[in-house]
């Protein structure tokens, strides 16, 4: 026969194991619904697996926006940069009215197979003269492209590291 003290200890241990298992299962299930933020530099360094949904934020790189239609739907390609790296983005749908080159955006989507393009399902554009999404602001600070004590974010159009001919060739080829 077990003493009361040992029985109480076993009950506490069993409850602890049960609670730990429940928390672990809950966190595992919750992880699949999370959408992490990444900057273009982080995407280039980490190469997230195709199909994994995450947020990509930065500045729309100058001279990279190409709009058209595909199967009757609006279709847009552009590049998002943080000043250190740029990632090509493909979006099918109507862009927000405030979307333009040199502005901050956050896109939600996943990398396509082959790790070549980010397939965005949602594009969120900057709204307001002084607004900058916090994650984009942190990525720009880390890249050394912006320090808020020196004023508004820099003109992202100055970050264009390709000629228009190179951009057109990379968008079509």
From Swiss-Prot:
GO terms for cellular component: plasma membrane. Residues 145-173 are annotated as: Disordered. Heme binds at residues 127, 131. GO terms for biological process: cytochrome complex assembly. It is found in: Cell inner membrane. One of its GO terms (molecular function) is heme binding. It comes from the Bacteria. Residues 1-8 are cytoplasmic. Belongs to the CcmE/CycJ family. This is Cytochrome c-type biogenesis protein CcmE. It comes from Acidiphilium cryptum (strain JF-5).
């Amino acid at each position: 026969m077990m003493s009361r003290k040992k029985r109480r200890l076993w009950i506490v241990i069993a409850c602890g194991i049960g609670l730990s298992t429940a928390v672990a299962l809950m966190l595992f299930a919750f992880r699949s619904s999370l959408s992490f933020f990444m900057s273009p530099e982080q995407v280039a360094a980490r190469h997230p697996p195709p199909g994994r949904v995450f947020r990509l934020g930065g500045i729309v790189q100058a001279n990279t926006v190409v709009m058209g239609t595909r199967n009757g739907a609006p279709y847009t390609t552009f590049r998002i940069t943080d000043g250190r790296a740029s990632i090509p983005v493909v979006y099918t749908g109507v862009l927000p009215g405030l979307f333009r080159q040199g502005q901050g955006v956050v896109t939600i989507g996943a990398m396509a197979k082959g790790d070549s393009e980010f397939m965005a399902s949602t594009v969120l554009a900057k709204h307001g003269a002084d607004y900058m999404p916090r994650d984009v602001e942190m990525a720009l600070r880390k890249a050394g492209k912006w320090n808020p004590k020196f004023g508004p974010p820099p003109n992202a159009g100055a970050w264009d590291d390709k000629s228009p001919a190179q951009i057109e060739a990379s968008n079509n080829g």
